[in-house]
């Protein structure tokens, strides 16, 4: 449909029809008996029959046949035959579940994540979906916040590269292309900066920090063509995001040039009343509309108030026209006016879901996401030894994270299922040992039942079996970690320990067999002090998805060499949170070897995290040569090449992530001690070496200056290249 046709359609629509295009309801409103819905949830929400029939989009309904029926029913009642948009959270997979986003960040391979997004789009579009609420590009520094699992980490550069790759993976070059869906980046903005890591909490950020650290990944997604943006629940410096005109109109639409559809998060507009920044629902509707929010998700704030506000002269109808037109434009870009079903096809849905190609990709992504945190020479495993797999994740299918409800945990391969195909049964034992969490821990999922409670007799039997297996083994592999319901939305944790019941088992196993390898399942950095001190090896595997167990076994046995590097610092303890490598310089830095009192430090713990950003070991070793610059001076229109030679100095083939950091040695505004500005993943055979070159331009040196503009200043800059954020391998150049 041409733009002029869309504008004519808009002109033919009544005010009520336009407002209802701005309403999104869940599938529950359409999949039940209409009378029951109207007298039940719709009545409770203040939604009338006309709203129900005219709502412009639907949340959480999928399946090709289901979608086609709902679309047919909807369009039969739609006076202008405008198709409905189908949206859902396809965060890291539809039916084939790829590693959680934080795990994908550990791959340092945005292109691989783009491939995963493309595969997810293929499955989702065949199921009738048009939009996915992904990627989440919020910067995360506080491990207490449960939603760190949905982010790719603490660094704005790394997040930006993943943001653009995932958007392109979902959308391709044209939304009409078969197998593609519209991408909605979220949550705009600063949601990851919630005070104390408590979900939905206040966000207070200086404009300097906000623009330098938090905004870049959103901008990268928008520049990549993201069709939609979702508002965040939080306030930004006192104003809720969903009614924040400065944030939505000035920054998002003005500075960033976003011209797509802006949707609220679930009930976020109405929640501004609870924030006490809106007097009532009508006031919230007025403010959100003036901020340019196009779709109200799952409340009647727009549907019940906007028409009246226009009639009373409180809001200008042209604001509603702007919102409605953007929604119509998105439907047109998806090709829905020509084909309202787009790619919905039950046969293709069946063929794509969990197909061998997607499973292979899920396994590859999982393998590349694993981070070897420690290895005292016990990995890869010697399969000739007696090995006991002991722990609650030994044969646990719940390894896909809480934000993957479109997938089925039964489709996930467990460690035991994979190991039984590789290890000699006569030399291998398996024991659960204990549940993931104790009976005293209460967890509530989205739709899941609360975890099973165990009797004292059951717990004792599980433990006894595990300890007997540990005594008889040469080495124990302990798959352990967080419960999947302990990470994700509304899962803030004040203490980021491995559950107590598992730590008790860990110590009891150590008492009978000191040769313990920990395989860690989790959706956030955890306090690993005890495990790090006592385990012989630690393999971080996050929530690895459908092929998690197969990937773990391949890495444990050395079939695949781990190559992941941390996208988020693991704090020494929770008292360090929030912590990140790119902190600002202070006036009293606590430099190595200093024993002075009046320094920026803790009395009881070190300043440094236990495991820093960018850290990751391998079954081989790598040497990085001194940094060589092709010139020591650079003008603003030039570039400097920074080179190192990376050599595999070990006995196994492997991949290393070579990381480029830059420090501004002097500026009018205090700058970070270092900032990631590039990375390269290189694969090397034993003894092989490769030159890696990074090209540095003036753009890499820009920051948010005192005058409110982005730019650089002349002066010296230190270039550091190594395999983690702790590298000091450096050279200096001058920007003229």
Where are these regions (language model features)?
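Glycoside hydrolase catalytic-domain context in secreted enzymes
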Residues: 1-702, 711-725, 732-736
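Flexible, membrane-facing loop/turn or short amphipathic-helix motifs
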Residues: 705-707
């Amino acid at each position: 449909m041409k733009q002029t046709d869309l504008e004519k359609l808009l002109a033919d629509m009544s005010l009520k029809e336009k407002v209802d295009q701005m309403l999104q309801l869940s599938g529950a409103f359409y999949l039940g008996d209409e009378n029951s819905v109207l007298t039940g949830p719709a009545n409770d929400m203040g939604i009338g029959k006309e709203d129900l029939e005219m709502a412009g989009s639907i949340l959480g309904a999928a399946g090709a046949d289901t979608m086609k029926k709902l679309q047919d029913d909807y369009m039969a009642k739609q006076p202008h035959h405008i198709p409905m948009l189908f949206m859902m959270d396809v965060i890291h997979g539809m039916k084939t579940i790829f590693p959680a986003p934080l795990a994908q960040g550990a791959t340092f391979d945005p292109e691989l994540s783009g491939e995963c997004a493309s595969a997810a789009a293929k499955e989702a579009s065949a199921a009738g979906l048009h939009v996915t609420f992904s990627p989440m590009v919020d910067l995360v520094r506080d491990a207490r916040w449960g939603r760190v699992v949905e982010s790719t980490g603490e660094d704005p550069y790394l997040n930006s590269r993943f943001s653009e790759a995932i958007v392109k993976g979902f959308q391709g070059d044209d939304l009409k292309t078969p197998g593609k869906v519209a991408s909605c980046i979220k949550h705009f903005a600063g949601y990851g900066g919630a005070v104390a890591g408590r979900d939905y909490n206040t966000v207070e950020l200086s404009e300097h920090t906000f623009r330098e650290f938090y905004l870049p990944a959103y901008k990268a997604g928008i520049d990549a063509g993201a069709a939609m943006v979702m508002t965040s629940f939080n306030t930004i410096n006192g104003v809720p995001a969903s009614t924040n005109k400065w944030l939505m109109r000035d920054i998002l639409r003005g500075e960033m040039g976003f011209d797509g559809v802006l949707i609220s998060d679930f009930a976020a507009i109405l929640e501004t009343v609870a924030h006490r920044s809106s007097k009532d629902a009508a006031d919230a509707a007025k403010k959100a509309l003036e901020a340019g929010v196009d779709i109200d998700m799952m409340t009647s704030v727009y549907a019940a108030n906007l028409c009246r506000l226009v009639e009373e002269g409180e809001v200008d109808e042209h604001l509603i026209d702007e919102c409605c037109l953007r929604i119509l434009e998105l439907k047109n870009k998806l090709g829905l006016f020509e084909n309202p079903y787009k790619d919905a096809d039950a046969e293709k849905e069946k063929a794509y879901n969990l197909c061998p190609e997607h499973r292979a990709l899920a396994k590859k992504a999982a393998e590349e996401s694993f981070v070897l945190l420690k290895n005292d020479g016990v990995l890869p495993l010697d399969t000739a030894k007696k090995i006991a797999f002991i722990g609650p994740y030994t044969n646990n299918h719940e390894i896909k994270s809480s934000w993957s409800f479109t997938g089925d945990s039964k489709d996930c391969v467990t460690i035991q299922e994979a190991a039984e195909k590789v290890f000699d049964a006569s030399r291998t034992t398996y024991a659960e040992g204990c549940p993931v969490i104790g009976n005293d821990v209460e967890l509530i999922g989205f739709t899941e039942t609360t975890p099973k409670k165990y009797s004292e007799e059951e717990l004792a039997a599980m433990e006894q079996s595990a300890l007997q297996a540990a005594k008889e083994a040469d080495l124990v592999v302990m798959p352990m970690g967080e419960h999947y319901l302990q990470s994700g939305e509304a899962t803030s944790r004040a203490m980021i320990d491995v559950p107590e019941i598992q730590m008790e088992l860990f110590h009891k196993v150590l008492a009978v067999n000191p040769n313990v390898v920990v395989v860690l399942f989790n959706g956030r950095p955890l306090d690993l002090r005890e495990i790090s001190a006592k385990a012989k090896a630690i393999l971080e595997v996050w929530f690895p998805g459908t092929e998690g167990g197969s990937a773990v076994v391949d890495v444990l046995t050395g079939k695949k060499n781990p190559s992941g590097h941390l996208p988020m610092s693991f704090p020494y303890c929770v008292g360090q949170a929030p912590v990140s490598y790119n902190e600002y310089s202070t006036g009293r830095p606590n430099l190595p070897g200093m024993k002075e009192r009046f320094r920026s430090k803790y009395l009881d713990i070190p300043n440094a995290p236990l495991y820093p950003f960018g850290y990751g070991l391998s079954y081989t070793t790598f040497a990085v040569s001194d940094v060589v610059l092709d010139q020591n001076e650079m003008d603003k229109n030039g570039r400097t090449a920074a080179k190192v030679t990376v050599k595999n100095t070990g006995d196994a083939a492997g991949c290393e992530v070579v990381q480029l950091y830059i420090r501004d040695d002097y500026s009018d505004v205090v700058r970070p001690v270092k900032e990631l500005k590039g990375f390269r993943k290189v694969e090397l055979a034993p003894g092989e070496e490769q030159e890696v070159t990074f090209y540095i331009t003036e753009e890499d040196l820009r920051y948010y200056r005192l005058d409110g503009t982005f730019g650089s200043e002349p002066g010296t800059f230190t270039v550091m290249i190594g395999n983690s954020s702790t590298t000091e391998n450096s050279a200096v150049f001058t920007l003229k």
